[in-house]
A protein has these predicted regions:
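Short acidic, glycine/serine/threonine-rich loops at helix termini
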Residues: 110-113, 167-168, 193-200, 251, ...
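Acidic, glycine-rich active-site loops and adjacent beta-strand->loop/helix elements
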Residues: 11, 103-106, 159-162, 187-192, ...
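Buried hydrophobic packing segments
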Residues: 74-82, 140-143, 166-174, 230-231, ...
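Conserved beta-ketoacyl condensing-enzyme motif
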Residues: 4-5, 29-142, 146-154, 188, ...
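Active-site pocket-shaping loop/turn-to-helix segments
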Residues: 13, 59-79, 127-135, 153-168, ...
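Structural signature of cysteine-dependent C-C bond-forming condensing enzymes
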Residues: 84-100, 114-128, 149-152, 175-184, ...
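Conserved small-residue
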Residues: 7, 25, 78, 99, ...
Length: 375
C-alpha cells in the first residue's frame, strides 16, 4: 500500500508555521537563546523558546484556555499540517482520523512545576491548572477534543527518536485499518530547567548559547516547539519506508545498531540527502561514522543548532524539514558545523533530490530512520 505525507506543520522558535520556519533555516538564521527560568540550584542553562505570540491563536480556543504551552504548540502545529493538507478549519474528521502524539518529557515538566509550587508555596498556591498537564496524553486529548475526533488517540513516550516510531505506528494503522483515512502525527516538547540539569549529569547539556555538531561533543541546548505530519493514501510526499527501530544496550553497540538500521532503510534506494539528529552529544559521532561508511557522498543537514534539541518533537521536525527539502528541491545549511563529517552541508543550496533519509539516535538508546520520496 502506498502512503503519503499529505501535509506538514510546525511551530518553532523561528516561526509560527512550517513555511516560515523553513524560510528561516534556509536563510541560515539561528533562533534566540534565553536562560531557563525557575532554576532549583545555581547552575544555569540556556534554551530556545517559542515566542508566546506564535501560539496566541491556539490559546484563544475555548477548549485550550486552561491548557499549558505544550498543548498549545501541538495544536498550532496540527492545524498548520491540516491546512497544508487542504483541510479547512471546522472540517469534520470524525472517526476517520487517528491522532498519534510523540512526546518525551513534557508531562514530567508539569509534574515538577506542580509539586514545586505545592512544597514551596503551600497547598493553596499550587495551580490546579497544572495537574491535568502532568499526564503524558493530555496534549493528545486536548487536540482530539478540539478537532472533534471520536476515533483513535494515542501517545507514544520516548526519546528524540520517538517521532519516527509514531510515524511508523501511523503507517501500520493505515495499512491494517482500511476504514481509517488519515493519521495526524504530532510531536511536541516544552523545556524545563530540571531537564537540562538531568542531562548535565550525563555530560549532555551545554552551558553556552551555542553548540557544535559533528565536532567537539560539548552537549546540547534544548529547544521548544511542535511539528506535525498528516499521513494518508492520496497524493503528497511518498513515505517509501518506515521501521520500528532498534535498541542498543551500550554506546559500544550503538555503531553496529545504527549501521543496521540505515542499511535496512536504504537498501538500493540511496537518498539524495540526509536530515540528521546530530545535537552535540555522542549521537554525532555515531551518525558521522555510519554516513561516512554507507553514504560518503550524500549531503547531510542537521537542524538542531538552529532550533535546539526538541526531544519528543525533534524527529517529527526532521521529517517536516525532509519533506520540505523534497518539495522545494533544496537542502538547508547546517549552523555551527564541525569538521568530522566532510559531507555536512554548510550552506543552503538547491539540488535535485529524489529521496530523503531521516535518522535519529536517542539518549534512551533507540535508533530509527525513515525514507521519503519525491512526489
Amino acid at each position: 500500500m502506498s502512503l503519503f505525507i499529505q501535509g506538514v506543520g510546525a511551530v518553532s522558535p523561528l516561526g509560527p508555521n512550517a513555511a516560515t520556519t523553513w524560510a528561516q533555516v534556509v536563510a541560515g538564521n539561528e533562533a534566540p537563546r534565553k536562560l531557563l527560568p525557575n532554576r532549583l540550584a545555581d547552575r544555569e542553562y540556556y534554551y530556545v523558546p517559542v515566542p508566546e505570540k506564535f501560539v496566541a491563536d491556539a490559546a484563544r480556543q475555548s477548549r485550550l484556555r486552561r491548557s499549558g504551552t505544550l498543548s498549545l504548540m501541538g495544536a498550532a502545529a496540527a492545524y498548520d499540517a491540516l491546512a497544508d493538507a487542504g483541510f479547512l478549519p471546522g472540517y469534520d474528521l470524525g472517526a476517520n482520523c487517528a491522532v498519534i502524539y510523540a512526546i518525551c518529557s513534557g508531562g514530567v515538566n508539569y509534574t515538577r512545576r506542580f509539586y514545586h509550587e505545592l512544597l514551596t508555596q503551600g497547598p493553596g498556591a499550587a495551580s490546579p491548572m497544572l495537574f491535568p498537564e502532568t499526564v503524558h496524553n493530555a496534549a493528545a486529548s486536548h487536540l482530539a477534543a478540539l478537532l472533534k475526533l471520536d476515533g483513535q488517540s494515542y501517545t507514544l513516550v520516548g526519546d528524540s527518536s520517538v517521532g519516527l516510531s509514531a510515524i511508523h505506528f501511523a503507517a501500520q494503522l493505515l495499512t491494517t485499518q482500511p476504514e481509517l483515512e488519515l493519521c495526524l502525527v504530532v510531536g511536541t516538547e516544552e523545556a524545563d530547567w530540571v531537564l537540562s540539569d538531568a542531562f548535565d549529569t550525563w555530560r549532555m547539556a551545554a552551558r553556552k548559547t551555542a553548540f557544535e555538531v559533528f565536532g567537539k561533543s560539548a552537549g546540547t541546548i534544548f529547544g521548544e516547539g511542535a511539528a506535525a505530519v498528516v499521513l494518508g493514501r492520496t497524493s503528497g510526499v511518498p513515505l517509501l519506508r518506515t521501521g520500528p527501530g532498534l535498541t542498543f544496550f551500550s554506546r559500544l553497540d550503538a555503531l553496529a545498531v545504527a549501521r543496521q538500521v540505515v542499511e535496512q532503510m536504504v537498501l538500493d534506494e540511496y537518498p539524495g540527502c540526509v536530515v540528521s539528529s546530530a545535537n552535540g552529544t555522542f549521537a554525532d559521532r555515531i551518525e558521522a561514522q555510519v554516513f561516512q561508511e554507507l553514504l560518503p557522498e550524500t549531503p547531510v543537514y542537521a537542524y538542531k543548532p538552529a532550533l535546539g534539541e526538541a526531544l519528543g518533537a525533534s524527529s517529527v521536525f526532521q521529517t517536516v524539514l525532509a519533506s520540505l527539502s523534497l518539495r522545494h528541491q533544496t537542502i538547508p545549511g547546517t549552523l555551527n558545523a564541525g569538521n568530522r563529517l566532510p559531507a555536512l552541508c554548510r550552506e543552503s543550496r538547491p539540488m535535485k533530490i529524489e529521496r530523503a533519509l531521516v535518522t535519529a539516535i536517542g539518549f534512551n538508546q533507540q535508533v530509527n530512520s525513515l525514507l521519503l520520496g519525491n512526489s
